[in-house]
Amino acid sequence: TKPSQMLPIFEFCRHIAGERIVPLISVHPDNTMNEVGVLFTRAAEAGIKGVKLHPMYQGFAIDDRKMYPVYQLIEHFGFFVVFHTGYDMAFPGNTQADVERVKTIADQFTDLTIVSTHVGGWRQWDRSGVLGKCRNVYTETSITMTEINDDQFIEALSQFDEDRVLFGSDSPWSDQKEMLERTLCLRIPDRRK
């Protein structure tokens, strides 16, 4: 949530990275592009695969042009980016992570692999279908099943090709085991589970 956390997050990620743990680094909009470039070089050398950004906590809109150089570097290094997408209960009324903003970036940076969290956008499931049409956008399932019923969840998932949906739990806000069990019980083909 602040520029000074960029390197400690990287060091932690580098330390825990392994075959079963794929940690994500982060940068802050106030980090210089030189700092970001150095970090991304070190991250690539360490085998880091992606970057997590949370617009509300980091103080930027997903489609803010000041972030374009960061997205270009993410694209250049072959990383993927995970955006918190949609509503955040700590920031009522904030639109910095709205689904439409992700769509703008997906259209501008067609080689950038994007993961739009919470089945396209937390509490924006009625609008997340626009992301399902973007070939470079994936989604993940974290915490969504705690908010909507199974039928609504399945409908939201259906907006995305099955090979672009990832399992997520948003631990510690939801229990990983419980989310996995609920996923396995969904009335969808096993190949989608």
Describe the role of every protein-language-model region.
Residues 22, 114, 165-166, 191-193:
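Secondary-structure boundary/capping residues
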